[in-house]
């Protein structure tokens, strides 16, 4: 089978995302369109989470991924971050086992965005999610966090600070968040890994500028 990349989006849709619906929808759709133009095959899964997870596409060829709209992305509820991430990893593990080594993706990328702290998971703990992530050198994880200490949360679940970003939870911050996500995916698809910090520069600069203003 021809080599391909699997991209799993795990996107927060809890109540605190209210007001940023169109920015999130637009950012996601723009990222998908940009990735369609990249060389190589890819499949996409997209999970929207609050206190439960909703799958809006499951291993769909990237060229066939439908645009997200307001019916898909409706914000409410609490934040079961651990259940969303842990559940997604376990599902992907099972799928890859069924596919067999010859049919598994060459690269597997998890994109996680959240604008709040974990507050309602029932099935997965920090320890359990960290154990899942630590055993997968073959998976790559990008963690984008707003209104939280993203580095601490990422560390608590085993994600490297090199692939973690604090971003501003406003319209511009959301746009730059998805620009950074697109840069990261493109780098991994092309080079097999993220080769420098340039992918995140816009998000970092905007966050640092606004943090200084608030202080």
Explain the meaning of each model-derived region:
Residues 1-215:
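Acidic, low-complexity intrinsically disordered regions
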């Amino acid at each position: 089978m021809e080599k391909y990349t699997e991209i799993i989006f795990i996107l927060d849709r809890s109540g605190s995302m209210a007001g940023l619906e169109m920015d999130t929808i637009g950012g996601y759709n723009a990222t998908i369109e940009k990735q369609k133009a990249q060389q190589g095959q890819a499949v996409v899964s997209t999970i929207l989470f609050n206190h439960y997870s909703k799958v809006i596409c499951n291993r769909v060829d990237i060229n066939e991924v439908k645009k997200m709209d307001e019916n898909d992305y409706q914000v409410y509820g609490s934040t079961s971050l651990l259940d969303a991430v842990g559940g997604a990893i376990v599902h992907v593990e099972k799928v890859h086992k069924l596919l067999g080594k010859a049919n598994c993706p060459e690269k597997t990328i998890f994109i996680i965005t959240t604008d709040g702290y974990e507050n309602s998971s029932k099935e997965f703990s920090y320890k359990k999610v960290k154990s899942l992530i630590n055993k997968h050198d073959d998976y790559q994880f990008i963690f984008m966090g707003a209104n939280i200490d993203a580095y601490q949360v990422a560390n608590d679940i085993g994600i490297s600070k090199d692939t973690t970003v604090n971003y501003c939870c406003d319209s511009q911050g959301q746009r730059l968040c998805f620009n950074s996500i697109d840069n990261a995916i493109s780098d991994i698809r092309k080079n097999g890994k993220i080769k420098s910090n340039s992918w995140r520069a816009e998000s970092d600069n905007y966050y640092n500028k606004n943090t200084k203003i608030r202080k």
